[in-house]
Amino acid sequence: IGQVNDYSYKDDPDKAVDSRYLHRGEFNWSLAPNRNIADTVQGKLFHALDHLEHIRSSHSVFDTTADLRTIDTWDSSILAIVRENAEEKFIGIYNFSDQDKVAWINEDDGIYTDLISGHEMEAKGVMIPAFGCFWLCRKK
């Protein structure tokens, strides 16, 4: 469902040095029913995550047996991860910057489909929006 960061962990001496507690605050159960209302923050997050889960379960390239590697994007704020098996090749491109960027990759093996949006594109010099991601995939 998602919730905002909880900085109260800093007030507990046993937790203050461990920033993982930022995401482990008390869950606000009163917001949980909102996941079924499409135009709420909780509904948008719930349905977006459900969509990603469906994508992952529909493609064998997400199996644990797939080969995994990174490719250089020539920008430290952009991460590109390749997953590959005999049937598919997947490139996940993630922009951790607050600015639109170009992932300077040069995969010249065909047209990919962004599994999230359905748009087709080449995996070359990919323009990626601020804090955006693409899940590019192609059949072999």
Across the structure, where does each feature detected by a protein language model lie?
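Loop/helix patches that line or flank the sugar-binding groove of alpha-linked glycan CAZymes
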Residues: 1-90, 96-104
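Compositionally biased, intrinsically disordered low-complexity segments
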Residues: 4, 81, 119, 129-131
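A structural detector for beta-sheet-dominated domains
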Residues: 30, 105-108, 129, 137
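A broadly conserved detector of short glycine/acidic/proline-rich loop/turn motifs that flank catalytic sites
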Residues: 33, 85, 97, 109, ...
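Hydrophobic, well-ordered secondary-structure elements that form the walls
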Residues: 52, 91-95, 112, 131, ...
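Beta-strand-rich binding/interaction modules
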Residues: 99-117
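C-terminal beta-strand-rich structural cap/linker in extracellular carbohydrate-active enzymes
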Residues: 122-140
